[in-house]
């Protein structure tokens, strides 16, 4: 009888292990987009592209949610965890504080955060060296400018967007030490990510000062910047996703930030406690050349930018990071 009892217990344990493994295998990953939504043609849409790629290749479904106000961040994260989603991806730095709280409450669930660092054993942090990619498009802007004046339009005024701006200015001045850079931020609240009208207004004000190339790191607000550039016959630079196709002929290039790869890889499996830093060397950022802008980028421009890219990867050019000490050291 003792032997039979042990056998029953063993079967029960094995059944539990198999059930847990099956539940884990069947768990659906989830992605929570931030303000602007998954069709913002920029940051969130890049995350959406990564999720869709995973879905297409795996043949499996995933969960997602588009927040419309700050309170929904924590609500959505907790709902996904309660539902058993795994892993759960928070897109954007603004989800950091709530995701840290929820991850502590659900220590057996796996999470990932993009554009922020959370030091927990069940959270993978994915950050980018935006200043390196911005350096390259800054060079491109200065080399393409006929007036010697280039512009920058940021979204919400936060250190992360200042990092874009600082890298852009460094690249522009590397290509042309005499270049003038005009810069504006759209606002100080999350609404700054989705205000195309304000983006257009800021771009037009820069054009009036002689700017003929403008880089927008502003989420959905950038759509207004790009349209203003097209209407004025100026050049614009996209961000996060490859936005060259939006206005062929006036989109000089895009500073591509591979949020799509970050989400795709996280869906395949997170590495809790790991901080994954993606720069030029890792293929996390770059500038985009395709059929929509190849006529705007001549061979000499590309040669100079590619040389700088190689030097950054080799460590010969050090691009200052605004977020290192909240200052732009040009």
Whereabouts are the PLM-identified features?
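Short, Lys/Arg-enriched N-terminal segments with co-localized hydrophobic residues
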Residues: 1-7
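A residue-level marker of the well-folded mature domains of exported/periplasmic proteins
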Residues: 27-330
């Amino acid at each position: 009888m003792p032997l039979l009892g042990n056998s029953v217990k063993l079967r029960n344990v094995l059944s539990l292990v198999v059930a847990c493994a099956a539940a884990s295998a069947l768990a659906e990953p989830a992605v929570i987009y931030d303000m602007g939504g998954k069709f913002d043609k920029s940051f969130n849409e890049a995350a959406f592209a990564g999720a869709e790629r995973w879905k297409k290749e795996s043949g499996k479904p995933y969960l997602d949610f588009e927040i419309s106000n700050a309170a929904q961040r924590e609500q959505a994260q907790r709902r996904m965890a309660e539902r058993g989603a795994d892993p759960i991806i928070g897109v954007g730095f603004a989800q950091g504080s709530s995701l840290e709280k929820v991850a502590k409450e659900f220590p057996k669930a796996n999470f990932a955060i993009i554009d922020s660092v959370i030091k927990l054993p069940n959270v993978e942090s994915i950050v980018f060296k935006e200043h390196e990619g911005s350096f390259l498009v800054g060079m491109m802007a200065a080399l393409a400018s006929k007036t010697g004046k280039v512009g920058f339009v940021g979204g919400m005024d936060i250190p992360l967007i200042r990092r874009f701006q600082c890298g852009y200015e460094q690249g522009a001045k590397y290509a042309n030490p005499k270049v003038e850079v005009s810069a504006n931020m759209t606002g100080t609240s999350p609404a700054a990510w989705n205000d195309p009208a304000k983006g257009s207004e800021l771009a037009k004000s820069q054009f009036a000062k002689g700017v003929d190339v403008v880089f927008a790191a502003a989420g959905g607000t950038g759509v207004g910047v790009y349209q203003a550039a097209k209407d004025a016959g100026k050049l614009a630079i996209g961000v996060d996703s490859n936005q060259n196709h939006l206005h062929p002929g006036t989109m000089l290039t895009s500073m591509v930030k591979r949020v799509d790869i970050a989400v795709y890889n996280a869906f395949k499996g997170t590495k809790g406690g790991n901080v994954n830093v993606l720069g030029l060397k890792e293929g996390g950022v770059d500038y985009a050349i395709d059929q929509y802008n190849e006529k705007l980028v001549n061979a000499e421009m590309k040669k100079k930018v590619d040389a700088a890219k190689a030097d950054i990867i080799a460590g010969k050019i050090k691009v200052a990071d605004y977020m290192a000490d909240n200052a732009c050291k040009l």
